[in-house]
């Protein structure tokens, strides 16, 4: 009988987390989780984070930095824990700040995100964009001379509908 109670309590905890977001948001978080779960074992671990950073062009991430990220979780990071962590961070958050923080996870030093990687991700992940949609976005937000996307301006336009002055 004890296992049934434990199972119900766990299911209840999960449903609270899932009720914090709309279905479309949950799907977007699932896609982000899948991208980060590089070894496809259902958990995000140190190796997954290191591989994700490498895919974004950050090859020299310190072990301490990755350890700090992992320590934010109460245990192994499965999708429910991942969603809970984002839910806690997003409570009462400003939409512009929230989106910027999502980009900053992959650009903590503020050096920029390579537009080639962004293009690839937008075209290959679930809910993918067409080549025409990608071309339109990069026509409006061309990469800088280093090939980086000005995501701060992009986020401002997404949340405010106009470019920063």
UniProtKB/Swiss-Prot annotation:
It comes from the Eukaryota. CDD domains: EFh. This chain binds calcium. The modification N,N,N-trimethylalanine is found at residue 2. GO terms for cellular component: cytoplasm; myofibril; myosin complex. This is Myosin regulatory light chain 2A, cardiac muscle isoform. Coiled coil: none annotated. Myosin is a hexamer of 2 heavy chains and 4 light chains. InterPro entries: EF-hand-dom_pair (IPR011992), EF_Hand_1_Ca_BS (IPR018247), EF_hand_dom (IPR002048), Myosin_RLC (IPR050403). Pfam families: EF-hand_7. Residues 24-59, 94-128, 129-164 form the EF-hand domain. Ca(2+) binds at residues 37, 39, 41, 48. The N-terminus is blocked. N,N,N-trimethylalanine, found in other myosin light chains would not have been detected in the N-terminal tryptic peptide in PubMed:7319048 because it would remain trimethylated and ninhydrin negative after hydrolysis. One of its GO terms (molecular function) is calcium ion binding. Keywords: Calcium, Metal-binding, Methylation, Motor protein, Muscle protein, Myosin, Repeat. The keyword Transport does not apply. GO terms for biological process: cardiac muscle contraction; heart development; muscle cell fate specification. It comes from Gallus gallus.
């Amino acid at each position: 009988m004890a296992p049934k109670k434990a199972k119900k309590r766990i299911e209840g905890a999960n449903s609270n987390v899932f009720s914090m977001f709309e279905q479309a948001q949950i799907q977007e978080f699932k896609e982000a989780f899948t991208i980060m779960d590089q070894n496809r074992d259902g958990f995000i671990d140190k190796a997954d984070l290191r591989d994700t950073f490498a895919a974004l062009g950050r090859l020299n991430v310190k072990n301490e930095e990755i350890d700090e990220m992992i320590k934010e979780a109460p245990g192994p990071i499965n999708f429910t824990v991942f969603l809970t962590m984002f839910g806690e961070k997003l409570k009462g958050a400003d939409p512009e700040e929230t989106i910027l923080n999502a980009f900053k996870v992959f650009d903590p030093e503020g050096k920029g995100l390579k537009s080639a990687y962004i293009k690839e991700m937008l075209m290959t992940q679930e809910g993918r964009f067409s080549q025409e949609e990608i071309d339109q976005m990069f026509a409006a937000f061309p990469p800088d001379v280093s090939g980086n996307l000005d995501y701060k301006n992009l986020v401002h336009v997404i949340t405010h509908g106009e470019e920063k002055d």
